[in-house]
Amino acid sequence: MTQLAIGEATPHGATYDGHGVNFTLFSAHAERVELCVFDSRGNERRYDLPGRRGDVWHGYLAGARPGLRYGYRVHGPWQPAQGHRFNPAKLLLDPYARRVEGELKDHPLLHGGHDEPDYRDNAAVAPKSVIISDHYDWEDDAAPRTPWGKTVIYEAHVKGLTYLHPELPQEIRGTYKALGHPVMVAYFKQLGITALELLPVAQFASEPRLQRMGLTNYWGYNPMAMFALHPAWASSPETALDEFRDAVKALHRAGIEVILDIVLNHSAELDLDGPTFSLRGIDNRSYYWIRDDGDYHNWTGCGNTLNLSHPGVVEYACECLRYWVETCHVDGFRFDLASVMGRTPTFRQDAPLFAAIKACPVLSTVKLIAEPWDIGEGGYQVGNFPPPFAEWNDHFRDAARRFWLPRNLTTGEFACRFAASSDVFKRNGRTPGASVNLLTAHDGFTLRDCVCFNQKHNEANGEENRDGTNSNYSDNHGKEGLGGPLDLMERRRDSIHALLATLLLSQGTPMLLAGDEHGHSQHGNNNAYCQDNALTWLDWQQANRGLTTFTAALIRLRQQIPALTGNSWWEEGDGNVRWLNKNAQPLSADEWQNGPKLMQILLSDRFLIAINATLEVTDIVLPEGEWRAVPPFAGEDNPVITAVWQGPAHGLCVFQRG
């Protein structure tokens, strides 16, 4: 290999062209950038990047090939009070690295947030970037592009979903390969979901605190390399990218979209006591929101916050998203703590990143889902994201639980949430699909735990049960824990059925947590982010098959109801919905606000949802006509009903007009 040629300022990152590699690095405040390459024995050779265009440093290394390990040393001022922490003694990861060799260890040589610089070299323990060739034969792959009105999302963890599946080959359980295996594809199709939403698959690290406790970051919300696949779920780091793309291709052939949970709000460098391995040493002042004293704005609760209003960081974020769409053919993203994306530092709908995404012909046409909050002032922004974003709707989650698990909730509030929270989302040209309805998600109780525990039980996390929310709106039905007498277990079953029916038969985009259709429990742990064990892995052999069948039937029913699949707002008199009381009359103003939790919802003039959320058996007079219960509510003896349904306590039934 020879000395570096000047090369080009684009594309960003390290690009192999068949003859060598073009390297670029964004740093607005650097004074000099060294490219460091390593041979198989760890010997290092350094080259100055000779070119600079604007804030992008660049150079071309002829003869460099895939497999080359490299990093950067960045020279510049050490001025912590001004946010500058340049230290060429520290080897740094390329923010655009497609593959990373080595883990991020809790090691003193990786710390760089102190007042004085540490001039000890860290190359022996620092992770290294690796050049790859990302050629792949996609064959005839095509994005399913499922309309929002027909979309049913299934949130899952790559490992936890398949690690205990007895019908999968042992060697692929808990891996990317398993996601596209015919056993899993057949299950997804049988269940009826249309989109698989994966918890973070970009390479992440375990926080030093967890490492010292002997725990690991299981969920993956601690990003280390945003362009690289997490290697632990692949046969080898070298094959991770192709194995993931194989899974995407197999899912697409079955008509199933793949949505990635992505963490564009902070990095694994954490606070000033965290490791320095990339952005902090490359251009701390540009990449992060810095306070006047040089410390970080911690609007994420993770120690730092990415400055997604800086032009260079906006470009980085958009290129990351485009990489996953163009190179891996993913169909969309769920953005963790997405209010950070709109901070300028106050939240704005016209924030630079939102504008860039909307203007991008690639990103503006995929599914974009925001977790519409962060922990900073003004961070709660449910309903305020601009099109084309959809949003997680915590109003729906809390209302559904409060309605069915005895809490105070009016019929009017329940109906509003059932109708895609039009008071929140019917603005700026948005459709009902913008409301992503959920009962549960990876953080919080599972659905089964919602009906078995009144209190969180997070002792295994090592924080003396202080972590995790205390606002669960759960109900153990009289006994804390999973077991109980038969009548209690039946009440819990009825509550689960009612909650699932509410989720899957409401207007909006439903999201189902993987395992809820099995009756999966985390034994009351509502923050299992560090539990990579049987607590979080789905036990397929112990799955509640009846509940799975019930859930699949609800999804099939949903797809038959035009009022739910049309993705247009319901208007009075349009035939989509009528709200009735227990006597089949329109709900009065008093019943909306003060009546018992009894109602009927007539959808598309032929599907009737009869609801008794009270504690008493109650007769409900059905509208005129002949009605027959539909699966999963129809029993073997399913007579036509023309007058009254005897609604059991905490009961729900769906009828179709004959």
UniProtKB/Swiss-Prot annotation:
InterPro entries (UniProt xref): GlgX_C, GlgX_Isoamylase_N_E_set, Glyco_hydro_13_cat_dom, Glyco_hydro_13_N, Glyco_hydro_b, Glycogen_debranch_bac, Glycogen_debranch_GlgX, Glycoside_hydrolase_SF
Matches recorded under Pfam families: Alpha-amylase, CBM_48, GlgX_C
Protein EC: 3.2.1.196
Keyword Lyase: no
CDD domains: AmyAc_Glg_debranch, E_set_GDE_Isoamylase_N
Site entry (Transition state stabilizer), positions: D443
The organism's place on the tree of life at top rank: Bacteria
Involved pathway(s): Glycan degradation; glycogen degradation
Signal peptide: none
GO biological process: glycogen catabolic process
Disordered: annotated span: 459-483
Enzyme class, first EC level, given as a word: hydrolase
The keyword Membrane belongs to this UniProt entry's keyword annotation: no
Active site annotation, chain numbering: D336, E371
Catalytic activity entry: Hydrolysis of (1->6)-alpha-D-glucosidic linkages to branches with degrees of polymerization of three or four glucose residues in limit dextrin
UniProt keyword annotations, A-Z: Carbohydrate metabolism, Glycogen metabolism, Glycosidase, Hydrolase
GO terms of molecular function: glycogen debranching enzyme activity; hydrolase activity, hydrolyzing O-glycosyl compounds
Family: Belongs to the glycosyl hydrolase 13 family.
Functional description taken from the UniProt entry: Removes maltotriose and maltotetraose chains that are attached by 1,6-alpha-linkage to the limit dextrin main chain, generating a debranched limit dextrin.
Name of the protein in its database record: Glycogen debranching enzyme
The organism's taxonomic lineage, starting at the top: Bacteria, Pseudomonadati, Pseudomonadota, Gammaproteobacteria, Enterobacterales
Gene: glgX
